[in-house]
């Protein structure tokens, strides 16, 4: 039997014991009221045989008059009803607390998984043929999923300052990944631009330079 099952079992036993105690208290009040009424009746008949017993009963407080007895029984019944409500709410709060703890653990696991996925994706996208915008979109979706999980964990957790630190770290990771993509894209653009300029310059230079055969003919003519 786990800790939760043991706790629920003990709560049920405690509630049962309290209910039994309330039932016995009500029966005791009824019995005391009955004894008090009988003592009053015997006093009227001046029964000498039970005089000492009657006096001992009547010397006690007289909370068992008809009005007082009804009030006490009403209070006992009301207290019993409120005790039942309190016990039910306590059990419900225990279950909710356990669900919150389980949800918090799941959120932390998902957040860690998202961080690991982003790190793996960061190294993977550098070897693919995806465009810059496709890579950036994937990074944004991964970062958004991780941040939503962290916000949910922050709402469920009582240590919100730790979750805020994790969220800041996640945002910096997403920003670093985005900046890395931008830097890679800029390098690609610069390389393409340099290659294009080099090819253009080479073709332009070659167009103004005569072919080797023509240059040789010109040299022979000059010698003649």
Swiss-Prot record:
Superkingdom per UniProt: Eukaryota
Location of region: Disordered: 198-224
Olduvai domain mapped to chain residues: 159-224
Compositionally biased residues, Basic and acidic residues: 198-209
Pfam family, one: Olduvai
InterPro entries according to UniProt: NBPF (IPR055306), Olduvai_dom (IPR010630)
SMART domains named among the record's database cross-references: DUF1220
Family membership noted in the UniProt record: Belongs to the NBPF family.
PANTHER family for this protein: NEUROBLASTOMA BREAKPOINT FAMILY MEMBER 6-LIKE PROTEIN
This protein's name: NBPF family member NBPF6-like protein
Species in which this protein is naturally found: Bos taurus
